[in-house]
Amino acid sequence: MTKFKHLLALAALLLAAGAAQAERLKDIASIQGVRTNQLIGYGLVVGLSGSGDQTTQTPFTLQTFNNMLAQFGIKVPANVGNVQLKNVAAVSVHADLPPFAKPGQPIDVTVSSIGNAKSLRGGSLLMTPLKGIDGQVYAVAQGNLVVGGFDAEGRDGSKITVNVPSAGRIPAGATVERAVPSGFDQGNSLTLNLNRPDFTTAKRIVDRINELLGPGVAHAVDGGSVRVSAPLDPNQRVDYLSILENLDVQPGEAVAKVIINSRTGTIVIGQNVKVSPAAVTHGSLTVSITEDPIVSQPGAFSNGQTAVVPRSRVNAEEETKPMFKFGPGTTLDDIVRAVNQVGAAPSDLMAILEALKQAGALQADLIVI
């Protein structure tokens, strides 16, 4: 224990003295087992101003409402006709349970309509248990919703909707009831998982930790994980990780990628994208058809009839654009400059990049989303 205390003190001094233009370890890696868990539940939102579910179309809302009343000893007679609960909506409730969350701590929840409720604005969520993937209840949610959107409709059928009124949030709307075991304090080692697996980054993390704490403290498991020795005492382990997560590590260069969103026309070109020698030209053919009818007017007293003679004009024009050439080692700046010079639109640039990839001149992964 004393050895680890001395080692941590020395590491803190070396860490404070070193200066590097790099990323913190906490920003490029996470600790295995320390993670967020998703919770989900089903409940009712009440207090809506006539914008709730139409129970004739969403029978599960009425069933849920009757089940809730039964828990309070209230039984709805079976001979009652269709009950219209315009102020009630069936909703799904989900939340993220952060690591190390303890019973009694509040967490935010998101509430979304399941039925055909027009708006959840002004509603209150009744007590809803939130379960994990194992079926255990980890939190209980309840409270007033904060809805950013709104919906308004006139008698003549005119309607306006701003944002999404059928979903909202409850800040600190759930209370944690059960903690999730993390395994953080078990074993004599910890595993760091890289957010973006890379062999170069993994090697640099190992070298940086061993340089600071001594050889053999860290070793790479693969391109996405690094295992480090850790003290058994929980207090020392926290001190140990507080030093590791603030280490400066220079990540490896990302794989060259070009991302194309064909729906929005967005194109993102990575910094390391290069193009082999190639010549590119991209023209467009425009075909226009115009109707120019001629009116035939007969002479006076000729007993003729006025007639319209159709006449169509078809014109084809091909826009010529200069050819631009990519030399060896062309970078992102060169590509952007060349494309701007010819005035290519996003759709034109997509076609050019796809053609360069097919020709084997684009040295990058082309990803269409």
From Swiss-Prot:
InterPro entries: Flag_FlgI (IPR001782). One of its GO terms (biological process) is bacterial-type flagellum-dependent cell motility. One of its GO terms (cellular component) is bacterial-type flagellum basal body, distal rod, P ring. Pfam families: FlgI. GO terms for molecular function: structural molecule activity. It is found in: Periplasm; Bacterial flagellum basal body. The keyword Signal applies. The keyword Lipid metabolism does not apply. Residues 1-22 form the signal peptide. Keywords: Bacterial flagellum, Periplasm, Signal. Assembles around the rod to form the L-ring and probably protects the motor/basal body from shearing forces during rotation. HAMAP family: FlgI. The basal body constitutes a major portion of the flagellar organelle and consists of four rings (L,P,S, and M) mounted on a central rod. Belongs to the FlgI family. This is Flagellar P-ring protein. It comes from Pseudomonas aeruginosa (strain ATCC 15692 / DSM 22644 / CIP 104116 / JCM 14847 / LMG 12228 / 1C / PRS 101 / PAO1).
